[in-house]
Amino acid sequence: MEKVCNAKIKYSYLGLDENGSLVIQLGFDCELGTVQTNRTDIIDAYFIQEILNTLELNRWEDLPRKYARIKVEGNRVIAIGNLIEEKWVKL
C-alpha cells in the first residue's frame, strides 16, 4: 500500500557502483521511520536535474537536511515530491 508523508532528507549518495554504473541513493527520516530510494538502473543528468528542480535546489550537496514529500511502498521510496507544490519525480 502506498503512503505519502513529509520527510527530512537524511543523506544523499551519488557515485559509481562496482560495475562503474552511476548510482544515486537518498535516505529520509519520516513518520514511517528511515526509508531510502533504491535507484540503481540507468541514471543520467536529466534524472538528477529533475530531482533538483522538483525540490527547487541547485546542487546535489544541498539535499541533506532539506524537506520533501515522499511516496513509500513497503520500506521503499517510489516518488519524491515538492513540499508545497504538486510536483513529483517517480523513481
Model regions and ranges:
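Short beta-rich binding modules
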Residues: 1-91
